[in-house]
């Protein structure tokens, strides 16, 4: 995923939330995504762990 991609994020106890990627930072353990959400328009960071499906919080949104 890259900047300006439309994504959904997994949050505690609720449905996936739509957002837009503002920044991407790569690390050896995974990737950090700064995602703009309705409640957080300036963005909030989410981490996707490499190699752990349970550690994936940001996914690319399906195209309509």
From Swiss-Prot:
One Pfam family cited in the UniProt record for this chain: DSRB
Stored InterPro entries: Dextransucrase_DSRB
Family: Belongs to the DsrB family.
Protein name: Protein DsrB
Organism from which the protein derives: Salmonella typhimurium (strain LT2 / SGSC1412 / ATCC 700720)
């Amino acid at each position: 995923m890259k900047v300006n991609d439309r994504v959904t994020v997994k949050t505690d106890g609720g449905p996936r939330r739509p957002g837009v990627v503002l920044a991407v930072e790569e690390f050896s353990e995974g990737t950090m995504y700064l995602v703009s959400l309705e409640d957080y328009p300036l963005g909030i960071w989410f981490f996707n762990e490499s190699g752990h499906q349970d550690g994936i919080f940001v996914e690319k949104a399906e195209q309509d």
